[in-house]
Amino acid sequence: LFYLFAEHKDAECKSVEDKAALIEQLKSCPNSVVVLDYTLFDINDASELLVFAERYVNTKWLLFSEDLSIDFVRMVLASCPRFSVVLKECTLSEIRMAITATLSGQRYICQRTMEMMLVPEVKEEKVKLTQTETEILKDIALGMTTKEIADKRFSSFHTVNTHRKNIFRKLGVNNVHEATKY
């Protein structure tokens, strides 16, 4: 992403690790474009993200994630016109278009997200997690890291990470905080 932003001469890139650092950067540069992988950042839910958007009204947001729930996307896009969405699976040209549009103050929604949003909402049945997924979710709720869970289960980190992704997908959530409400 740094390379893609470097294509825009007026863009200066900085990276932050957590909410506190993001707040400091937004205080000093309120006209920023924030590229955010919501699923990996320490923002708890859509409401908290929207508070950031309300607080920093000149900031534009580009959500750049692997997997976002459709309910989350609908809520964010309906609540604030300064959010754009592009998925990590998108083509390089689509990611470039998202960056260019967001930098120029336009909203960009990638093709895959648009397709997801056009699918009518369906009343879902009770989510069925496998026994393994339920056990892993309990360990997550206890605050264990993916590595700790893998060690406990005598599994690889990648196996547990795949279970985590499946849990998030089945529950229709984007992060640990939302998943543990289940």
Regions found by a protein language model. Name each.
Residues 89, 96, 130, 137, ...:
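Conserved catalytic core of two-component sensor histidine kinases
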Residues 114-139:
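Regulatory hinge/linker segments at domain boundaries
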Residues 1-116:
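N-terminal regulatory/sensing modules of transcriptional regulators
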Residues 143-178:
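Recognition helix of helix-turn-helix DNA-binding domains
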